[in-house]
């Protein structure tokens, strides 16, 4: 018989979700600065997208493995917390080493070191994020699920905004340099990653220490599971060929609406990845009028020197991209408040299509604006 899951206080829900702030802080720093870092380390403008392939590949590989493994784990730390803590420690390592890639030039080319650290960060963020979502689902009763997701959304947006603007703040408020020569990383970016690593580890440790997961028997009672059901989770897996066959059968039998949505999502992610990969060079060229030749490592290596105006423009543009990404997170948070009501009034398809259309127009509008304040 299913027992009633205890209700949590506001601060208990806050503690369960608090680590999301740190994880999203790290994601925001990565999204706004990885192209900037790799470009400074010597990546060609046209090869940046190859480095960014790491993110979806790691997501495809890591999330299902970690999700399945955490479902089968019960130890002194609990079910989800071991993965959250391990992922946070690995992510912190990547966040510290990535901006310091030039220090390892005796062992690895800085660009290769940077690529490896991006891979480590992406894998680690996924190790953190998947169990975090499951932890909220495990700990928060259905009657408080909306409150839980609201707090989660608030913390995610706070982390995204602060992480995005941090390099700008370190330069314009603290006074750190935001410029770097080829093969180096700007001090403001280096310190932003140090601070991000500290915030990530601190918030995750807070959640791990302040949250006590349910024991297996308690969890089974609250979720209405029998003793036999968890045991089936440890049953031997079907052969790979059988699992692939089942996967393609599921895809074939997927409802028509889901297939249509999959196509739309497929193309909409094009825009998101172009934004993450190329916003920094696009803003630098279009707003700061830096010629594209100054993104060519071969041209820079052959030039007698890089003009100070080019170096300063690249640094300022990189900081401003963080401001743009912070604004993106703020407006997304505001719009999400009204999204449900708009969908109820006009229908989900209409609201979704309108949102995509507005997003497309916003993309095109980058060509029309030549000033920072526009």
Annotated model-derived regions:
Residues 44-54, 112, 150, 187-188, ...:
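Loop-to-transmembrane helix entry
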Residues 82-84, 192, 348-354:
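Juxtamembrane helix-start motifs in multi-pass secondary transporters
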Residues 61-78, 334-348:
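Helix-to-loop junctions at the C-terminal end of transmembrane segments
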Residues 2-58, 259-264, 268-296, 300:
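Helix-loop boundary and gating motifs at the non-cytosolic
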Residues 56-60, 64, 161, 329-337, ...:
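Residue-level signature of mid-helix packing/kink "hotspots" within the transmembrane helices
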Residues 1-10, 107-116, 127-128, 132-133, ...:
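Intracellular loop-helix junctions on the cytosolic face of multi-pass helical membrane proteins
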Residues 83-108, 357-371:
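C-terminal ends and interior cores of transmembrane alpha-helices
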């Amino acid at each position: 018989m299913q027992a009633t899951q205890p209700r949590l206080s506001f601060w208990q829900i806050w503690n369960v979700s608090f680590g999301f702030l740190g994880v999203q802080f790290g994601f925001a720093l990565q999204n706004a600065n990885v192209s900037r870092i790799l470009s400074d380390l010597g990546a060609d403008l046209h090869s940046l997208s190859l480095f960014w392939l790491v993110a979806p590949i790691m997501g495809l590989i890591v999330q299902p493995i970690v999700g399945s493994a955490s479902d089968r784990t019960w130890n002194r730390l609990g079910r989800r917390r071991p993965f959250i803590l391990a992922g946070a420690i690995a992510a912190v390592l990547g966040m510290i080493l990535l901006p310091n890639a030039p220090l390892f030039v005796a062992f690895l080319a800085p660009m290769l070191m940077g690529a490896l650290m991006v891979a480590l960060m992406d894998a680690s963020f996924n190790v953190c994020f998947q169990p975090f979502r499951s932890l909220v689902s495990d700990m928060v009763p259905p009657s408080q699920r909306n409150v839980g997701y609201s707090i989660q959304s608030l913390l995610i947006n706070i982390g995204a905004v602060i992480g995005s603007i941090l390099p700008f703040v370190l330069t314009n408020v603290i006074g750190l340099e935001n410029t770097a020569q080829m093969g180096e990383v700007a001090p403001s970016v280096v310190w932003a990653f140090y601070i991000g690593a500290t915030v990530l580890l601190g918030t995750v440790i807070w959640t791990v220490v302040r949250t006590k997961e349910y024991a297996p028997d308690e969890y089974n009672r609250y979720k209405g599971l029998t003793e036999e059901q968890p045991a089936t989770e440890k049953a031997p897996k079907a052969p790979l060929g059988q699992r692939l066959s089942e996967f393609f059968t599921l895809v074939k039998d997927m409802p028509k609406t889901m297939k249509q949505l999959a196509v739309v999502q497929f193309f909409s992610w094009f825009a998101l990845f172009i934004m993450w990969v190329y916003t920094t060079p696009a803003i630098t060229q279009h707003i700061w009028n830096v010629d594209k030749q100054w993104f060519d490592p071969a041209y820079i290596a052959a030039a007698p020197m890089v003009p100070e105006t080019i170096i300063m423009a690249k640094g300022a543009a990189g900081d401003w991209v963080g401001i743009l990404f912070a604004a993106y997170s703020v407006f997304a948070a505001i719009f999400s408040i009204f999204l449900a009501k708009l969908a109820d009034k006009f229908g989900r398809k209409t609201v979704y299509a309108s949102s995509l259309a507005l997003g497309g127009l916003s993309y095109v509008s980058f060509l029309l604006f030549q000033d920072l304040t526009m």
